[in-house]
Amino acid sequence: MTIRTFVLVAALVSLGSALHAQEPVVGVKDPESLFKDPDPMLNRNKQATLHIMRELLQCGQWDRAGEWLTQAYHQHNPNAASGLAGVVTFFTKVLGVKRQDKCDKLTTEVVAVIADDAYVTVLMPRKYPDPRKAGAEYYTTWFDTWRFVNGKADEHWDPATIAPPAAK
């Protein structure tokens, strides 16, 4: 095989694999099982993260946010304000999230939960419209990372971008 043939075959093989490279991101069957750790500090932070995910983000129980977020709560999402009051206002007033009283199981799909020192990162599947093809969708992974101080989230990061203005 000549070098030219080898390069051509390699290019065609890589092109074919690129067209079929993406596999959907899939969550685990029991996401709550990922929020446990044998290390007491990591377990406390993972459990607080579970409450943030379940009671706050899933069920909108923002009246309880002070149980798991500090007053300072440094927010790095460009759409939400920092501070406990700021993030509560963002979810309850700006997004209009309604409170659900029954909240006994996390239903959000979760791929993995990673804890290291004061940080907990949750990886979740996300599906978006494919901008290259009308009606098609693609999958990717969203993440939320929190830094904990004394068992409460004090700082948050995610890959959010600035939301477009609301349609008038």
Question: What are these language model-derived features?
Answer:
Residues 62-118:
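A solvent-exposed, acidic/Ser-Thr-rich amphipathic alpha-helical stretch
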Residues 98-101, 128-139:
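Short, cysteine-centered beta-strand-loop-beta hairpins and adjacent loop/turn segments enriched
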Residues 116-126:
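A short hydrophobic beta-strand element
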Residues 23, 139-167:
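Short beta-strand edge/turn micro-motifs at domain boundaries
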Residues 21-63, 67, 71:
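Short, low-complexity N-terminal intrinsically disordered segments enriched in polar/charged residues
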Residues 8-9, 19:
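Cleavable N-terminal signal peptides
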Residues 1-7:
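Bacterial N-terminal signal peptides that target proteins for export
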